[in-house]
Amino acid sequence: MIVSTAAGDYGLADFAAPLPLAGLAGLAGGAGRWEVEIGFGKGRYLLRRCLDSPLDGFLGVEQVAEYQERFVARARRRRARNWVALRGEALYLMSAVLPRGFAAAAHVYFPDPWPKSRHHKRRLFDPETVDLVAGLLAPGGRLFFATDFLAYGELVWELLAGYPGLTVTRRDGLWDDGPRTNYEAKYIALGRPILRLEASAEAPPALHPLGREAALAATWRKKA
């Protein structure tokens, strides 16, 4: 697993796990307020946020090496310094590496819906692991989600609506700042329906009843 910043690339073994929030701020030029994007793909939205809000910190998680490297190259070329990009499996990183309750906003756009029933265990959102995503939010933080796979979107809606301390609303139409990802722009052009959700955290994040280690075990059961 690779940790990339404006200053260079590192191995995950170079850092304590879970990553301390102060350590993240040090990696991103002293940033205070944080946003995280899980599965940032080619990095269109993540880079835009970095450039638009240079005093905030942005953490991106992406498993595909080509996409992570593309974002890193573009961010360095634009001389953005307020970001950290982690290359690795999102469920593992959320359960074992990322701090809890640190993000003012979390973004999950068009995650793989794994439509075949035998692959559902690989989904980012399911009853065992929804708290890994929701648990990233600080009190008052917001989670933004979009998918074109409507059945999966309905499942995510139900999971978030039933999660303690979250208030969930459906978004009608585009985000206020327009399409946020390449997929979203493409699907809008094709006229494909998109389900968008916004959830607000009213309290500190919950956690798996048995704690972080149980959440990690649930993650690896999904991969088995």
Task: State what each model feature region is.
Residues 125-139:
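A short glycine-rich, Lys/Arg-flanked "PGG" loop and its adjoining helix->strand segment in the class I
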Residues 116-124:
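Glycine/threonine-rich flexible loop motifs
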Residues 33-92:
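SAM cofactor-binding core of SAM-dependent methyltransferases
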Residues 128-131, 154-175:
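Conserved Class I S-adenosyl-L-methionine
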Residues 1-31, 167-224:
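SAM/dcSAM-binding transferase cores
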Residues 139-147:
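Conserved beta-strand signature within the Rossmann-like core of class I S-adenosyl-L-methionine
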Residues 96-105:
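A short acidic, Gly/Pro-enriched loop at the edge of an enzyme's catalytic core
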